């Protein structure tokens, strides 16, 4: 069953009467990479963090439908929320690795949602999970790095570990919050290519918040433009002409 995500009337206010997200409506269905672009402060990261409930939405619906069932992520609580989060992989801008742990140990944290507290504390993981972790290290180009500490890796290597860790969850939906912002241009291309490939291989939608419009055009089959907490564009890269980019970014100086 193909994964679908339907966001309806999503509002997030950090202060009453000042919404960061102001009535977001968005449907994501099937595999493919969707890029979210827009100026800083327009709510791109807030949107992704609402989807996987790192922050609480103020109102609205976030309905995830996949092979495991249907759940409104905006309303679910307790153990049901923990189970729902297992279905969503997250790749972070600043990697969010445990620096003192090895690459392998960081990957295995992606299975904590499926592991008892005692086994997690004792670092006892299913042999099948360990085998999959080695396979994913090969997939992301880090074969032979299993025993290296995370704090010894470059930024690009850390982001590859972050992607592999997210894939360890066997997610039905993959979110990536500014995955290339701290990387050089060559590595940024490699990371976007990897995200696109893994979305296709695993048959899941990938939702990426990104500042680089050209990377979005190159790798996304769909681009969502946000401005002022609203969706102002939803289409492919061909529709992102100078007029639309001015609508999204509120000026032309960025083009110079």
Swiss-Prot record:
Its main location: membrane. It is a peripheral membrane protein. GO terms for molecular function: ABC-type phosphonate transporter activity; ATP binding; ATP hydrolysis activity. Residues 5-253 form the ABC transporter domain. The keyword Cell membrane applies. Its EC number is 7.3.2.2. One of its GO terms (cellular component) is plasma membrane. It catalyses: phosphonate(out) + ATP + H2O = phosphonate(in) + ADP + phosphate + H(+). InterPro entries: AAA+_ATPase, ABC_transporter-like_ATP-bd, ABC_transporter-like_CS, ABC_transpr_PhnC, MetN_ABC_transporter-like, P-loop_NTPase. The keyword Cell membrane applies. Keywords: ATP-binding, Cell inner membrane, Cell membrane, Membrane, Nucleotide-binding, Phosphonate transport, Translocase, Transport. It is an enzyme of class 7 (translocase). It is found in: Cell inner membrane. Pfam families: ABC_tran. The complex is composed of two ATP-binding proteins (PhnC), two transmembrane proteins (PhnE) and a solute-binding protein (PhnD). Part of the ABC transporter complex PhnCDE involved in phosphonates import. Responsible for energy coupling to the transport system. Belongs to the ABC transporter superfamily. Phosphonates importer (TC 3.A.1.9.1) family. This is Phosphonates import ATP-binding protein PhnC. The gene is phnC.
């Amino acid at each position: 069953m193909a994964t679908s995500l339907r966001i309806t009337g999503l509002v997030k206010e950090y202060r009453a009467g000042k919404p960061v997200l102001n009535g977001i409506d968005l449907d994501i269905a099937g595999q493919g990479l969707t890029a979210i672009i827009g100026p800083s402060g327009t709510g791109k990261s807030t949107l992704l963090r609402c989807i996987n409930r790192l922050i609480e939405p103020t109102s609205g619906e976030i309905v995830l439908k996949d092979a495991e069932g249907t759940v409104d992520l905006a309303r679910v609580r307790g153990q049901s929320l923990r189970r729902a989060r297992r279905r969503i992989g997250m790749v972070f801008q600043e990697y969010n690795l445990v620096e003192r742990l090895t690459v392998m140990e960081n990957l295995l944290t992606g299975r904590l949602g499926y592991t008892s507290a005692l086994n997690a504390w004792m670092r006892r993981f299913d042999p099948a999970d360990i085998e999959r972790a080695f396979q994913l290290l090969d997939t992301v180009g880090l074969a032979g790095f299993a025993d290296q500490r995370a704090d010894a890796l470059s930024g690009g290597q850390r982001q590859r570990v972050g992607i592999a860790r997210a894939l360890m969850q066997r997610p039905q939906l993959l979110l990536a919050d500014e995955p290339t912002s701290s990387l050089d241009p060559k590595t940024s291309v490699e990371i976007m290519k990897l995200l696109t490939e893994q979305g296709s291989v695993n048959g899941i939608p990938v939702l990426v918040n990104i500042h680089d419009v050209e990377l979005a055009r190159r790798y996304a089959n769909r681009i969502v433009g946000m401005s002022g907490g609203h969706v102002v564009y939803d289409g492919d890269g061909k529709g992102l002409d100078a007029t639309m980019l001015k609508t999204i970014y509120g000026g032309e100086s960025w083009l110079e």
